[in-house]
Amino acid sequence: YCSVDLRNAGFKLAPVDTNLFPGAFNNLPQETLPLAVQAAMASIEKICPDAKNLLVIPERHTRNAFYLENVARLATIMRQAGLNVRFGTLDENVAGPVTIALSDGQKLVIEPLERSQRRLGLKNFDPCSILLNNDMSGGIPPVLENLHEQYLLPPLHAAWAVRRKSTHFSCYDDVAKKFAKLVEIDPWMINPYFAHVEGVDFQARTGEEALADAIDG
C-alpha cells in the first residue's frame, strides 16, 4: 500500500520518493483492477486473514474531486477483495454522516469516528482493520493512538509529521544492496544518490548554503 516515484535515466532506474498514503488509485487503468484486487486479497490474507470490516480514514479535504475519486476507487478494490468498507473522518466538525456525490454518479458517505477505550470505529461498525489514507502532516491525532486490538495501516510512525526521508533512503539503501547481491547487479543501478544535511529550515531560510554545497558536491 504505497506509491513510488521512479526516475529513469536510461542507464539506471531508481525510486526518488515513496508515499505511504497514496492518492491516485483513480489513475489505475480499468484493465489493471483485477490485479489490484488480487494484490489486496494477498495482503489481507497475510496481515489479517479474518478481516471482514475495514475502516478507511481519508484526508479532511473532502471537496477535492480528484482525491475523492481516488478514495472511491480504493474502496472498490477493497470491496471486491471481500471487505465491508466504510469511511471515517478526523474532522471533529462532522457530527453525522455526510454524503458526497461524485462526478461519475457514485456517492461516498463520510462518518464521524467513535472511540472507545481500546478501539476505533463508527456507529454500528466495529472494524478489525483501519486503513489510513491521511498523511497526518499536521501531527498524529490522539484518537488514533493506543489502539491495541486493531490493525492500523500504515503504522503511526509512518506519519509525515514524524517520518524523515533521510531515514527512508537509508533503509532503502540497505534493501537495494541486499537485492542487488541476490540478483547479481550493481546496486548503483537501482539506488538514487542521497545525502543528509542538518539544520535546514526553508521557512527560516537557514541551512540553504549547506544544502546547496551538498548538491554541488
Enumerate the predicted regions with their spans.
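Conserved metal-phosphate-binding beta-hairpin within the catalytic cores
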Residues: 1-25
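Short glycine/proline-enriched loop/turn "hinge" motifs that connect secondary-structure elements
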Residues: 6-10, 47-49, 144-146
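Residues at the starts of beta-strands that form the adenosine-phosphate
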Residues: 12, 53, 84
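Residues that cap or initiate secondary-structure elements
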Residues: 12, 60-62
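C-terminal active-site "lid" helix and adjoining low-complexity regulatory extension at the edge
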Residues: 19-55
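Conserved N-proximal alpha/beta basic substrate-recognition cap immediately N-terminal to
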Residues: 38-39, 62-216
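Short glycine-rich phosphate-binding loop at a beta-alpha junction
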Residues: 53-58, 129-131
